[in-house]
């Protein structure tokens, strides 16, 4: 009985480790994540960044963004692996469509769209956003707001 319990535990452990490693590999080649930031009454940067599974990214800076206009960049495979694995672990498709409180004013929103190759999910994050989603937003904003490696489309 003890050996059977140990075998069941080992099988479950192996299956859970294996499923987390498959995250990005299970996504269709057309998968992408997009971050859009919305304006506020102050100087909140507004932009849209889209990153494809293969690392190709586009950025469109509008108001108060360090980069104004259209930019492109290719992120490393390691960066993409970490990012898309995190998104898969977050189970975006099961999340609510909005985190907000309409009584709270003048907060910009971070709108995340994830497309896995078949289905897409857009989540508007403005108020009372769970910590794991805030971590994803922080990671996406760091990638978007960096100035290194982005090339203006007009310079291509």
What name fits each language-model region?
Residues 1-15:
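Sec-dependent bacterial lipoprotein signal peptides
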Residues 5, 17-41, 73, 86, ...:
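Short, well-ordered, aromatic-rich surface patches in folded extracellular/luminal domains
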Residues 37-65:
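Post-signal-peptide N-terminal segment of Sec-exported extracytoplasmic proteins
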Residues 46-48, 68-70, 120-122:
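Short, mixed charged/polar active-site loops
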Residues 58-95:
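A short-motif feature that recognizes glycine-rich, charge-decorated loops
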């Amino acid at each position: 009985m003890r050996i059977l319990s140990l075998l069941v535990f080992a099988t479950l452990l192996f299956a859970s480790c294996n499923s987390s490693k498959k995250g990005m590999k299970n996504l269709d080649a057309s998968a992408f994540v997009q971050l859009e930031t919305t304006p506020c009454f102050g100087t909140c940067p507004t932009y849209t960044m889209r990153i494809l599974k293969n690392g190709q990214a586009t950025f469109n800076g509008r108001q108060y963004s360090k980069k104004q206009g259209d930019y492109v960049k290719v992120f490393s495979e390691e960066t993409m692996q970490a990012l898309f694995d995190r998104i898969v672990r977050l189970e975006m498709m099961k999340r609510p469509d909005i985190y907000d409180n309409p009584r709270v004013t003048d907060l910009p929103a971070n709108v995340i769209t994830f497309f896995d190759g078949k289905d897409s999910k857009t989540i508007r994050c403005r108020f009372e956003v769970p910590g794991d989603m805030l971590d994803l937003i922080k990671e996406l904003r760091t990638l978007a707001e960096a100035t290194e490696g982005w090339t203006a489309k007009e310079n291509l």
